[in-house]
């Protein structure tokens, strides 16, 4: 099932979570992710590092697309997030890794709300 939310961020649900526990703004979450450019070129992966990523969601610690999409996932859910440039790294990109205004694709799994 695919859903488009604010910022034209797309959420493609790959496997369900518990459908009960959703993070709220300010919650510390633990996530596994793999980030690619639209052409499939991988730029980062917590899975490859073998270490999940933790952040406070909904408070500007991560890109806007994550702040918008992660609260729509329940614990255990896997999804593919397609995030347009303005909700990713915008016109500055991430030099050496992500071109300016690039649309990014993240395969994410919400492991837990800490």
UniProtKB/Swiss-Prot annotation:
Chief location: cytoplasm
Record InterPro entries: FKBP-type_PPIase, PPIase_dom_sf, PPIase_FKBP_dom
Domain PPIase FKBP-type: 26-114
Alphabetized UniProt keyword annotations: Cytoplasm, Isomerase, Rotamase
Location(s) in or outside the cell: Cytoplasm
E.C. number: 5.2.1.8
Reactions listed under catalytic activity: [protein]-peptidylproline (omega=180) = [protein]-peptidylproline (omega=0)
GO cellular component terms, A-Z: cytoplasm
Pfam families: FKBP_C
GO molecular function, one term: peptidyl-prolyl cis-trans isomerase activity
UniProt-listed Gene3D superfamilies: 3.10.50.40
Disulfide bond annotation, renumbered to this chain: none
Regulation: Inhibited by both FK506 and rapamycin.
Broad EC category: isomerase
Superkingdom: Eukaryota
Function: PPIases accelerate the folding of proteins. It catalyzes the cis-trans isomerization of proline imidic peptide bonds in oligopeptides.
Family (UniProt): Belongs to the FKBP-type PPIase family. FKBP1 subfamily.
Name assigned to this protein: FK506-binding protein 1
């Amino acid at each position: 099932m695919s859903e488009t939310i604010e910022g034209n961020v797309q959420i493609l649900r790959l496997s369900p979570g518990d459908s009960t526990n959703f993070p709220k703004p300010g919650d510390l979450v633990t996530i596994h992710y793999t980030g690619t450019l639209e052409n499939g070129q991988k730029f980062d992966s917590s899975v490859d590092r073998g270490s999940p990523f933790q952040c406070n969601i909904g408070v500007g610690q991560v890109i806007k697309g994550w702040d918008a999409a992660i609260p729509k996932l329940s614990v255990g859910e896997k999804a593919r997030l397609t995030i347009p440039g303005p909700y990713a790294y915008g016109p500055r990109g991430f030099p050496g890794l992500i071109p300016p205004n690039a649309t990014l694709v993240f395969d994410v799994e919400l492991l837990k709300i800490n």
